[in-house]
Regions:
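Short N-terminal targeting/anchoring amphipathic segment
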Residues: 7-12, 69-88, 104, 215-218
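A charged, aromatic-enriched C-terminal amphipathic alpha-helix characteristic of glycosyltransferases
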Residues: 277-310
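Active-site proximal beta-strand in glycosyltransferases
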Residues: 77-82, 93-113, 128-131
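Short hydrophobic beta-strand element within catalytic cores of glycosyltransferases
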Residues: 237-246
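Conserved donor-binding/catalytic core segment of Leloir-type glycosyltransferases
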Residues: 8, 157-178, 184-188
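Donor nucleotide-sugar binding/catalytic pocket of nucleotide-sugar-dependent glycosyltransferases
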Residues: 112, 124-157
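Acidic donor-binding loop of glycosyltransferase active sites
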Residues: 76, 210-223, 236
Length: 313
């Protein structure tokens, strides 16, 4: 499915690299897509253009308004992320409507988690709302689900090893939110080597978890993130806390079993133990994980979902 004439500006952040993956996949479909960000993130600096805002609020706003004026004639659809717009929301959506431009608001998790519906009501001004999982949809029930996508050609499976002391990798963006203290405590009770990966550029972090035998994502949020997605893409078994309802809805929507081993802080040791004790089990779950990613998180498949949403704006 291609729409060669469609011009889509994704903005204004590259949170977790999700916007950049979407832009790249849309380009492979023949779409004129670009990513414009306020600033480049240290861990995910990819973007076609950074506004590199300087100075105080007034100067930053002036930079953003100039960017909007420049992008309006070049854009059919503005695809916003993380609850942010180029200019204040109270003006952004009326301007787009007046200019006959379409818009999408794409939430990425922490921007909506736990917020009351009244606080998110403004998102109805966008032509469509997107969330990344059937867990996040409880915060924005009218949203469409488009999971984060990755370019599978960049991920070669590296099956877990058969070493007697498996390497467990945990990469917390926030130790408190990811439950890192419980991961450390659990690994101290098992014959494993724990490696905590923090503050590395995305490519460097990838090289670290490609050496993992087991990956622990998070124990609090109720769904998995990009770290888990990339780990599964290279054939690693992943342990993470998942909400049962979100698992059921995901399996129904995509027709595939979610292979992640669900655990809480209290059950982490017992859930890790079979993976620690059996290299065969690690490889089995790892292979199932790669197959799941091919079905659910292939960026090219997900670009088709985005194009379908765009066509209905």
């Amino acid at each position: 499915m291609t729409i060669p004439a469609l011009r889509v500006t994704h903005c204004p952040v590259n949170t977790a690299g999700v916007p950049w993956q979407n832009v790249q996949a849309l380009r492979r479909k023949g779409v004129d897509a670009r990513l414009v960000v306020f600033e480049r993130y240290k861990l995910h600096p990819e973007a076609d253009e950074s506004l590199d805002r300087r100075g105080g609020l007034a100067r930053q706003q002036a930079t953003q308004w100039r960017a909007l004026a420049r992008l309006l004639p070049r854009t059919d659809i503005f695809h916003f992320y993380f609850g942010l717009t180029l200019v204040p929301k109270s003006l952004q959506f009326p301007i787009l409507r007046a200019a006959r431009k379409k818009s999408v608001m794409h939430f990425l998790g922490s921007d909506i988690r736990g917020k009351p519906s009244a606080e998110l009501a403004w998102a109805a001004k966008a032509g469509a709302r997107i969330v990344g999982s059937y867990d996040a949809i409880r915060w924005v029930p009218e949203a469409e689900v488009v999971p984060p996508g990755i370019n599978l050609s960049e991920y070669t499976p590296v099956p877990p090893s058969d070493r007697e002391r498996p390497v467990v990798v945990h990469a917390p963006s926030s130790r408190r939110r990811k439950g890192t203290e419980h991961v450390i405590a659990a690994c101290e009770q098992l014959p494993v080597s724990l490696e905590i990966v923090e503050g590395l550029h995305h490519d460097d972090a990838r090289r670290r978890y490609e050496r993992a035998d087991i990956v622990v994502d998070q124990l609090n949020a109720g769904w998995y993130g990009l770290f888990a997605i990339e780990a599964m893409a290279v054939g690693k078994p992943v342990v993470s806390f998942l909400h049962d309802e979100a698992v059921a809805r995901t399996e129904e929507a995509f027709g595939v079993r979610v292979p992640i081993v669900s655990a809480t802080a209290d059950t982490l040791v017992e859930r890790l133990r079979p993976l620690v004790e059996s290299a065969e089990e690690r490889r089995r779950v790892g292979a199932e994980s790669r197959a799941y990613i091919e079905r659910v998180h292939d960026a090219d498949r997900l670009a088709d979902r985005l194009l379908d949403i765009y066509s209905r704006l």
